[in-house]
């Protein structure tokens, strides 16, 4: 998987094959001011966070519940230190695990499963994921799981990935948002239109707090989701305005990017901004606001809707 040299691991991964795209501000300013997070932190009476030890503060693993048997959400990227820290944390608190939830298939969330099974072979039948593999258990939208002190309700939220699941912690009116809503910065997406619908769906649950897969606790989840939606709609408007400005001749994606992303590093432009603009254009085409024609094997876009 090709990536910009200075944006490896954690929630900066870009999978070009799946057209997971990112924003220029996501890849620059947002990476410069990450907060200091402890390797292990008790966030609430029911939630302990363990950092995945991968880049950019890594992927959060959450230990959920209050009793001797609890569940965890996500397993990091497979960094050996993560397994050591998790094992020590569980032993110090005399905790065993009953369920392992994977928010989605990306490697920085599933990579620790082999280490987890090496440490706890009894969990072999307790790995849960939407669209599961042959050795995993299914998670369905609305499915409820319980451990002492915690009732977890699964919410299917595709867009970042087709199998993405979020989890509501009923006792706290909180949501484990996975990669759909990050503690810091903006998520990358596979399908922008689907992702925006997912954000609206998540917002409809009216959870107050978010526990993201990357970054610190989101203390005002409705405001964060509203900001994400506003940003996506603002980007759409910018692309439409750009097309309108240059519409005397239909343009390919790269030319729209050159106008829209002036001043962006060329590698970031190619790896992040251009795929993102292409995703915006595809969504706008589905909405009937833009269209394209093929010239010399290249899509050339033009606006057809009213701004």
UniProtKB/Swiss-Prot annotation:
Listed transmembrane segments: none
InterPro entries: LACTB2-like_MBL-fold (IPR047921), Metallo-B-lactamas (IPR001279), RibonucZ/Hydroxyglut_hydro (IPR036866), Sec-metab_biosynth-thioest (IPR050662), WH-like_DNA-bd_sf (IPR036388)
SMART domains cross-referenced by the UniProt entry: Lactamase_B
Enzyme class name: hydrolase
Active-site residues from the entry: 108 (proton donor/acceptor)
Catalytic activity: atrochrysone carboxyl-[ACP] + H2O = atrochrysone carboxylate + holo-[ACP] + H(+)
Cofactor note as given: Binds 2 Zn(2+) ions per subunit.
Keywords from the UniProt entry: Hydrolase, Metal-binding, Zinc
Binding-site positions, Zn(2+) 2: 108-109
UniProt note: phenotype after gene disruption: Impairs the production of monodictyphenone and any of the intermediates of the pathway.
GO terms, biological process: monodictyphenone biosynthetic process; secondary metabolite biosynthetic process
Sites where the protein binds Zn(2+) 1: 104, 106
Keyword Transferase: no
GO molecular function, one term: metal ion binding
Pathway(s) served: Secondary metabolite biosynthesis
EC number, UniProt record: 3.1.2.-
Cofactor: Zn(2+)
Keyword Cell membrane: no
Family: Belongs to the metallo-beta-lactamase superfamily.
General function of this protein: Atrochrysone carboxyl ACP thioesterase; part of the gene cluster that mediates the biosynthesis of monodictyphenone, a prenyl xanthone derivative. The pathway begins with the synthesis of atrochrysone thioester by the polyketide synthase (PKS) mdpG. The atrochrysone carboxyl ACP thioesterase mdpF then breaks the thioester bond and releases the atrochrysone carboxylic acid from mdpG. The atrochrysone carboxylic acid is then converted to atrochrysone which is further transformed into emodin anthrone.
Protein name, per record: Atrochrysone carboxyl ACP thioesterase
Organism: Emericella nidulans (strain FGSC A4 / ATCC 38163 / CBS 112.46 / NRRL 194 / M139) (Aspergillus nidulans)
Gene responsible for this protein: mdpF
């Amino acid at each position: 998987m090709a990536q910009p040299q200075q944006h490896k691991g954690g929630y900066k991964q870009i999978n070009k094959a799946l057209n997971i795209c990112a924003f220029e501000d996501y890849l620059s300013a947002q990476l410069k001011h990450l907060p200091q997070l402890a390797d292990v932190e008790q966030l609430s009476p029911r939630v302990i966070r363990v950092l995945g030890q991968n880049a950019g503060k890594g992927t959060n693993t959450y230990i959920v519940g209050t009793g001797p048997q609890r569940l965890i959400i996500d397993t990091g990227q497979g960094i050996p230190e993560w397994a050591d820290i998790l094992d020590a944390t569980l032993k110090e608190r005399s905790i065993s695990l009953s369920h392992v939830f994977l928010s989605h298939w990306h490697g920085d969330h599933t990579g620790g499963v082999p280490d987890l099974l090496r440490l706890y072979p009894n969990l072999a039948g307790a790995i849960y994921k939407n669209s599961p593999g042959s050795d995993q258990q299914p998670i369905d939208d609305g499915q409820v799981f319980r451990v002492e002190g915690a009732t977890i309700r699964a919410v299917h939220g595709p867009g970042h990935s087709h199998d993405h699941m979020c989890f509501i912690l009923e006792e706290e009116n909180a949501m484990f948002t996975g990669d759909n809503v990050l503690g810091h910065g903006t998520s990358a997406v596979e399908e922008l239109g689907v992702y925006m619908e997912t954000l609206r769906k998540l917002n409809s649950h009216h959870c107050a707090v978010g526990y993201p897969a990357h970054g610190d606790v989101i203390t005002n989840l409705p405001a964060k989701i509203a900001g994400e939606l506003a940003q996506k709609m603002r980007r759409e408007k910018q692309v439409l305005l750009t097309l309108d400005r240059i519409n005397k001749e239909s343009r390919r994606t790269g030319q729209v990017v050159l106008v829209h992303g002036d001043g962006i590093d060329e590698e970031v432009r190619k790896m992040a901004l251009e795929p993102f603009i292409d995703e915006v254009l595809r969504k706008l085409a589905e909405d009937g606001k833009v269209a394209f024609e093929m010239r010399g094997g290249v899509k050339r876009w033009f606006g057809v809707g009213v701004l």
